[in-house]
Amino acid sequence: MKRSIVTGGGNNDKKFKAQPPPKNNYRGGGDDEEDDEFEEDDDEDEGDEFGEEEDEDDIDVENIIASDSMDIDIQDDGSQQLFLWSRKPVQDLVPHKKPLIFQQLEVDYTEIKEPVPGMPGPKVGPLPAIRLFGVTKEGNSVLCKVHGFLPYFFISCPPGFTEADCKSLKHDLNESMKMSSNQSNEKDIENIVVSIDIEKKKSIMGYNPNPLSDFIRITLILPKFVTRCREIFESGRHHFTIPGQPFRQYQTYESNILFALRFLIDKGITGCSWIELPANTYKLSETPVSTCQIEVDTSLETIISLSDDDSPAPYRILSFDIECAGRKGVFPEPEKDPVIQISNIVKNNGDAEPFIKNIFTLKGCSSIVGAHVIPHKREEDLLREWRKFVIKVDPDVIIGYNIVNFDIPYLISRARQLKIPEFALLGRIKTTISKIKSTRFSSSNLGTRESKEISMPGRTQFDLMQAIQRDHKLTSYSLNNVSAHFLKEQKEDVHFSIISDLQNGTDDDRRRLAVYCIKDAVLPMRLLDKLMILINYTEMARVTGVPLSYLLGRGEGIKVLSQLYRKAMVENFLIPTYKVTGKGEKFQGAIVIEPTPGFYDTPIATLDFTSLYPSIMMAHNLCYSTLLSAEEAKKLPPEIYTTTPFGDHFIKSDTKKGLLPRILEELLSARKKAKDELKNEKDPFKRAVLDGRQLALKISANSVYGFTGARVGKLPCLEISRSVTSFGREMLDKTKKIVEERYTIANGYKHDAVIIYGDTDSVMVKFGVKTVAEAMEMGRDAAKFVTTTFIRPINLDFEKVYYPYLLMAKKKYAGLYWTKPDIHDRMDVKGLEMVRRDTCLLVRNVVSTILKKILIEKDLKSAEEYTKSVISDLLQNRLDLSMLVITKALSKTQYKGKVIHNELARKMRARDPATAPNLGDRVPYVVIQGSKGAPIYEKAEDPLYALEHNILLDCQYYLDKQLKAPLIRIFKPIMSNPDLIFHGEHTRTIAQSTLSDNNKGFFGTLKKKKVCMNCPKELTDTESTTCINCQHKEASLYQTSLEKVTSLETKFSEAWTQCQRCSGSLHQPVLCSNRDCPIFYMRTKVQLDLIEAKKTLNRFNVEW
């Protein structure tokens, strides 16, 4: 059941009252860090909680575990199923003889009450322990607890402060920390501040030719104390002073980095890397706290990070989906509506097929080929058994579609309502319940989205909906539309309003629901494989060094910050902690050389700068550590620094190479290596890994510039970002000047070259030659020559030729794309409506067809005639509703004015809050006819509502506001007067609505009066079909009506059969309401047309 709607959480029943967890057991998954330590990306914001969250101290975990039977109640081939579910047993693990090697997938930390004997660190608790969850090559699950790592941060060392002052500072800071605490148990901790040390470092901000200077390192006992201690220094909290120093505020360094990420950076471990624990450096946990097969304790000092070139481990992936039985007209709510089915698909990473496909059902269900049906009599049993199934299968990664915002929260809230406390123990830590909190994520690329964050230690939740929203721009993100787009297949969508009827029906009815539910678990797994999503994200985690779970829940900044911290640590640089304000000076973006619009029937060569922004940063050594102020620059010889076109100053690389340029060099060098290996690799799986790696490296390199320019980022630097774009503008102008001055008739060439357009990193050159081969030759020569005028590694590359080329405006063009002189690769379109998401399908299809006729067929007359026929069909309501649906993202809750999709969302919320669009969703709508002068936002309507209520669309709006502008843009460079396309015989017949008793009029014209079927004459009471003057044509009219009914019946039968095939049965009625499927609207339209056609045919009073 895939819905983008998220309903409220659980009840307020404080059923579980708690005892503390058993001694030496671990109690949580890093949820004790203070809030702002989790705000790793500045575009995150925490919202209200989902339902009610219980702390672990509110749950009697001890009693739950004691009463939690893991006996699984399944029928028929139960022993075989249990064997399939279980992992392979561990073989020959002898800690003092053999190393333990595993791939870590999830990293977090917990607090332990007492230290583990033999492990480093303080000898009195509480203490933090890093937890690495992973899988061995044999497929065994691992929990490795790393001891001895403590949180720390730095402050600048005041003058006169020495090693002798460290002890008194530690004492005073401990006292201040205890005074500021409102927790009694914190006051009992002897040393919140574990140590004060002086280290030689330097700040990354600004060029500093001097040697390293003193900084104070403050080490604390637990991560949750970092924020409070930082505030003491930054804000002068409690007027704290360093002994012997006047009262002042201090700049802190590296005080807002997540504790688990700090560990990975300090140990040189990347996300999803392989870990080795050498023999005799680890021991099996005496009191296991997890459900992992292997649980060990080890020291911080002995853990080893291995090369990340090895193949991924065979980790287990669970894809699941749930179905709920809602009440009539109400979207399911966990407080009231039962979970009736849960489907599951399980496979090992790297395998082609799943080894588990089953479905847990409430009540009986007919058998399903290829799936194991596990029925239950009570909902409580279904939920308990499914949770046991999850624990038994022990998945490393849980996937699905919208599971984070719907399925998992619904299951947890429903179990709470049914008083099943053990259900929330879904993670791998036996005493840690899964908690849910609401978050709000914002970024310039992705907009604002509300989401949930679910703690499930040891299991990575990977919501395919979130991944696809991040990586692909689609008109709709429903599972139906995504599957149609990527897998080229539609799926049946059973509306939630009829699910209860199916559930209350027969075993066969529930089987139909089960087939639908299973498909919603199968499709995410297929999308995962098709798009190589997990492979690509795993490689991104390795490249950037962050845990896999950070990549979906956080923005781009965390990835760059991780790389910057790693490089800074090696160089003894410190990264300052700044308050995020979201304010700052804006700067001019990239230049666009003004286009010369036209239809070019000669080849246009395109020259592209390779990795433009990274290349500029490397060429000019742009970095935090090389930045000079104007005053500092005046004191230095001008030959050792660069002055950017914007007037900023940076030290040149031969004096001091910056960290950012070195990071970029390593990323691009590694990408080149991955691409070279990809060319020679034959194994499909290894090819996918290498391709994912080179893509991750490319994205990471391109993200560095954006990181410096993010005004709400962790380390914004306007001087870097504006310098990059100013160099880019200068380079485009220089390229234009060189090409137009060199390739001229005066210099011996056949034509004068002209730059007809330039945008950010590309220039389009008209050399005047007649063939693609000639344009390619001159393009290569020009790229090579211009490159010699720039500083390395800036490189201008010839990439392609457009021929023919239709240039309409800035960022709006189309052409045939050639990389070989003999045949074009494809039709390439930029900025036009066929690639935009805020236009209806009609516009995209029409623009695409017209461009094919102009560019490929080179038949302008055919393009004109086709356009006129579409306009005629539109004005006469002969088009499917699916062609006229528009979608826009709901990115804000409040807009300055009345915005069409926001107003529709309000209207839908008033009708049914449960099914209304949420923040971040794309809102589909159609424009209906309204009163004269009505604003457009009043005429927006939900397509399904319009369909069900037979509301006539405003076809004139679609012509004037959707079709006309893009068509004028296309035809203007080709025709002398493109407006003529919108006038003429084909525009004279326009469908009008005359309301009948039942308010019909959605797809056709309805008449008030009974008139002759051949002429406009009104009929008498004795006439039913034709007037007396047209009676001789009655037979012909009858034949036409009969043929129309027959044709519509055939169309309806074909649509009905197609829908039946999609549902998996040719013997059951069609229930699908997939609004992303054009067949759904076509079937309904044909059905309505057929009703009207039969009414017309019945006027002939023919006896059958």
UniProtKB/Swiss-Prot annotation:
Domain of life according to the entry: Eukaryota
Reactions catalysed, as given in the entry: DNA(n) + a 2'-deoxyribonucleoside 5'-triphosphate = DNA(n+1) + diphosphate
One protein family per Pfam: zf-C4pol
Note describing how the cofactor binds: Binds 1 [4Fe-4S] cluster.
GO cellular component: delta DNA polymerase complex
Amino acids binding Zn(2+): C1012, C1015, C1027, C1030
Record's subcellular location: Nucleus
Zinc finger (CysA-type): 1012-1030
EC number: 2.7.7.7
InterPro entries according to UniProt: DNA-dir_DNA_pol_B, DNA-dir_DNA_pol_B_CS, DNA-dir_DNA_pol_B_exonuc, DNA-dir_DNA_pol_B_multi_dom, DNA/RNA_pol_sf, DNA_pol_B_thumb, DNA_pol_palm_dom_sf, DNA_pol_type-B
Disordered as annotated region, ranges: 1-60
UniProt keyword Acetylation, yes or no: no
SUPFAM superfamilies: DNA/RNA polymerases, Ribonuclease H-like
Keywords, comma-separated and alphabetical: 4Fe-4S, DNA replication, DNA-binding, DNA-directed DNA polymerase, Exonuclease, Hydrolase, Iron, Iron-sulfur, Metal-binding, Nuclease, Nucleotidyltransferase, Nucleus, Transferase, Zinc, Zinc-finger
Gene Ontology biological process terms in this record: base-excision repair, gap-filling; DNA repair; DNA replication proofreading; DNA-templated DNA replication; nucleotide-excision repair, DNA gap filling
Cofactor: [4Fe-4S] cluster
Acidic residues: compositionally biased ranges: 31-60
Enzyme type, top EC level: transferase
Residues annotated as binding [4Fe-4S] cluster: C1059, C1062, C1072, C1077
MF GO annotations: 3'-5'-DNA exonuclease activity; 4 iron, 4 sulfur cluster binding; DNA binding; DNA-directed DNA polymerase activity; nucleotide binding; zinc ion binding
Span(s) of short sequence motif CysB motif: 1059-1077
Domain notes: The CysB motif binds 1 4Fe-4S cluster and is required for the formation of polymerase complexes.
Role of this protein: Possesses two enzymatic activities: DNA synthesis (polymerase) and an exonucleolytic activity that degrades single stranded DNA in the 3'- to 5'-direction.
Subunit structure, as described in the record: Heterotetramer composed of subunits of 125 kDa, 50 kDa, 66 kDa and 12 kDa. The 125 kDa subunit contains the polymerase active site and most likely the active site for the 3'-5' exonuclease activity.
Family affiliation: Belongs to the DNA polymerase type-B family.
Stated name of the protein: DNA polymerase delta catalytic subunit
Gene: pold1
